[in-house]
A protein has these predicted regions:
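Acidic-and-aromatic substrate-binding clefts and catalytic sites of carbohydrate-active enzymes
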Residues: 7-17, 41-52, 77-85, 107-114, ...
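Mid-to-C-terminal alpha-helical segments outside catalytic/metal-binding sites
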Residues: 1-33, 218-225, 234-311
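Catalytic pocket-lining loop regions of alpha/beta-barrel enzymes
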Residues: 112-225, 234
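Active-site neighborhood of phospho(di)ester-bond hydrolases with catalytic His/Asp-centered motifs
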Residues: 1, 36-38, 74-76, 101, ...
Length: 333
């Protein structure tokens, strides 16, 4: 799901990534589409790496994929640094973005201290039909409990927690998954999770496996998205990327040991279909924006029988949208 270009500090060291770094990592693993955000637009005000929403948008719009890998831009947003959504709205009006990205930890603008402006950005996303993705970690800034509160202010809008609750202890991770599950099952929110960087990828393999299984049990495959954070650190290596993808696949198959067909469906959802629906097909948004048949008929009242019949036929026999590049199975490298 997620990739990055741009500049940031990682463990005190300034690093810069570009689109070719992503392509070199994912192309050998048969990845066709990557959602990408600008790290430059997710830095704190005052840092030498800080880049405004406008300038970081230029950076992300200018990136290029190739014939095999499409790079789909997310708008890096700065609630708290920006006091309103004016700039973001203009950028969305003029350019094609697939979602809004928030990183309260890196921008140093805690959700709890800037709740109203974060909510305004989500209101803008609702208007534009764009999912919102949050860096999620219990650190006082990007806390999952605060993201859940935001989501419950916008109960129909899809919001994705990257990393679920990054690097948290098993008990804390379980609580976060339970909180997300409770909110969704109560109809209070439309939350999803991404399973990148749950903990250190290799040293805590068993813990990562348990987290994925807990998520499958509590949330189901419909609300889980594969993610990698490519090309940051280990995920800038194509072999490690493939190793992690295989790890996720093996874990899901293990969870569905007695139901292999369900396991295959779950893998399709996690690796492809969920992201395709949320960010590209967007039936969740199109359904809201289309008038109902009854409303369409009411529009024709007073215009004449022929007009009413024409509208009814259009409503009843509208062409179905074709799903582009819908995967039928999990591709192995």
């Amino acid at each position: 799901v997620q990739g990055h270009i741009g500049t940031m500090y990682d463990n005190g060291q300034k690093v810069t990534y570009n689109s070719q770094n992503i392509i070199d990592t994912v192309e050998p693993n048969n990845v066709k589409k990557v959602l990408v955000s600008s790290l430059s637009g997710l830095n704190a005000l005052g840092q030498d790496t800080f880049c405004s929403e406008t300038e970081s948008a230029k950076e992300i719009i200018a990136m290029k994929g190739n014939d095999n890998v499409k790079l789909l831009p997310l708008l890096s947003c700065q609630p708290g640094i920006a006091q309103d959504t004016t700039v973001a709205e203009k950028l969305l009006d003029k350019n094609k973005f697939y979602g809004l990205k928030f990183h309260p930890s890196n921008t140093n603008k805690a959700i709890k201290d800037n709740f109203d402006i974060y909510s305004k950005y989500i209101t803008l996303a609702e208007k534009k039909g764009l999912p919102c993705v949050f860096h999620s970690i219990t650190d006082g800034k990007s806390d999952p409990v605060e993201i859940i509160k935001l989501a419950e202010q916008h109960p129909k809008h899809p919001i994705i927690l990257y990393h679920i609750d990054l690097a948290s202890q098993p008990e804390q991770m379980a609580r976060t998954i339970d909180n997300i599950s409770s909110s969704v099952k109560a109809g209070k929110s439309n939350l999803f999770i991404d399973i990148s960087w749950l903990t250190n990828l290799w040293d805590n393999a068993e813990q990562n496996k348990n987290t994925i299984k807990q998520a499958l049990k509590k949330l189901g495959a419909d609300r889980i998205l594969f993610g990698s954070d490519t090309p940051i650190t280990e995920m800038g290596n194509r072999d490690n990327y493939g190793k992690f993808a295989d790890f996720v696949e093996d874990t899901v198959k293990e969870f569905y040991t007695d139901k292999p067909k369900e396991g295959e469906k779950a893998l399709n959802k996690i690796f492809y279909d969920n992201a395709e629906e949320l960010f590209i097909n967007k039936n969740w948004f199109n359904a809201k924006s289309q008038p109902s048949k009854s409303k369409a008929l009411l529009i024709g009242v007073g215009v004449g029988i022929a007009a009413i019949v024409a509208i009814a036929l259009k409503c009843l026999h509208g062409a179905d949208k074709t799903v582009e590049n819908s995967p039928s199975h999990v591709s192995k490298k």
